[in-house]
């Protein structure tokens, strides 16, 4: 079972990726983790990636595809894998197809921008423990204080409204075209494309995924 997850930051992909990995026993392949692992292992591709990154440049699509191909031959990918954060663009999706990396399911998590802003901007964190609260959906007992320690809660830099809106604009410009790309692929019988309503409770979304994936 080979799966691609699509959706804006804050659409709930991370939570559902965890559910899919545990239920179906397939690994999540994150391009960032893969690059770091290749560099650390000192493989041929890792050396190339390190040179590019050390020069402050972006790693090419060709190199990332080569890394994905190498990664999915490993034993833990025998029953499939989950791609999150890749492909991000049409050229990357085309390159994957040309490299013979076929995908069974493309799952799009659909959440309106305003709800995403609401979800992310309302997050409050207790940095020492990693506990996460939300001013509206999961408030602490005392406003601005951690339940267990009474210490102050903070807002992550990435969770500020301006940053969130900027990331959403980038997502719509770069990644949203993949939605029509994979819809066409599905119409041609090359994959199954499903749009998931990500505004519902986590358990409801997980239940729908279990029905889709079988």
UniProtKB/Swiss-Prot annotation:
InterPro entries: Adenyl_kin_sub, Adenylat/UMP-CMP_kin, Adenylat_kinase_CS, Adenylate_kinase_lid-dom, P-loop_NTPase. Disulfide bonds: none annotated. Residues 122-159 are annotated as: LID. Residues 139-160 are annotated as: Disordered. SUPFAM superfamilies: P-loop containing nucleoside triphosphate hydrolases. It catalyses: AMP + ATP = 2 ADP. One of its GO terms (biological process) is AMP salvage. Residues 142-160 have a biased composition (Basic and acidic residues). ATP binds at residues 10-15, 123, 132-133, 200. Pathway: Purine metabolism; AMP biosynthesis via salvage pathway; AMP from ADP: step 1/1. The keyword Ligase does not apply. GO terms for molecular function: adenylate kinase activity; ATP binding. Pfam families: ADK, ADK_lid. Its EC number is 2.7.4.3. It is found in: Cytoplasm. The keyword ATP-binding applies. One of its GO terms (cellular component) is cytoplasm. Keywords: ATP-binding, Cytoplasm, Kinase, Nucleotide biosynthesis, Nucleotide-binding, Transferase. It is an enzyme of class 2 (transferase). HAMAP family: Adenylate_kinase_Adk. Monomer. NCBIfam families: adk, PRK00279.1-1, PRK00279.1-2, PRK00279.1-3, PRK14527.1. Consists of three domains, a large central CORE domain and two small peripheral domains, NMPbind and LID, which undergo movements during catalysis. The LID domain closes over the site of phosphoryl transfer upon ATP binding. Assembling and dissambling the active center during each catalytic cycle provides an effective means to prevent ATP hydrolysis. Belongs to the adenylate kinase family. This is Adenylate kinase. It comes from Serratia proteamaculans (strain 568). The gene is adk.
């Amino acid at each position: 079972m080979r799966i691609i997850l699509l959706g804006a930051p804050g659409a709930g992909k991370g939570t559902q990726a965890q559910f899919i990995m545990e239920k179906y026993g397939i690994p999540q392949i994150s391009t960032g983790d893969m690059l770091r692992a290749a560099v650390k292992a000192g493989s041929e591709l890792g050396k190339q990636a390190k040179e590019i990154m050390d020069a402050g440049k972006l790693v090419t699509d060709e190199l990332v595809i080569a890394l994905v191909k190498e990664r999915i031959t490993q034993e833990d990918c025998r029953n499939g894998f989950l791609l999150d954060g890749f492909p991000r663009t049409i050229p990357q999706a085309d390159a994957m197809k040309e490299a013979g990396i076929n995908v069974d399911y493309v799952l799009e998590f659909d959440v309106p921008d305003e709800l995403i802003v609401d979800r992310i901007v309302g997050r409050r964190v207790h940095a020492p423990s990693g506990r996460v609260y939300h001013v509206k959906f999961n408030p602490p007992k005392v406003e601005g204080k951690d339940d267990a320690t009474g210490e102050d809660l903070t807002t992550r830099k990435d969770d500020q409204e301006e940053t969130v809106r900027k990331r959403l604009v980038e997502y719509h410009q770069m990644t949203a075209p993949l939605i029509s790309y994979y819809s066409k692929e599905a119409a041609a019988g090359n994959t199954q494309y499903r749009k998931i309503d990500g505004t519902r409770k986590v358990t409801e979304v997980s239940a729908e995924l279990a029905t889709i994936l079988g």
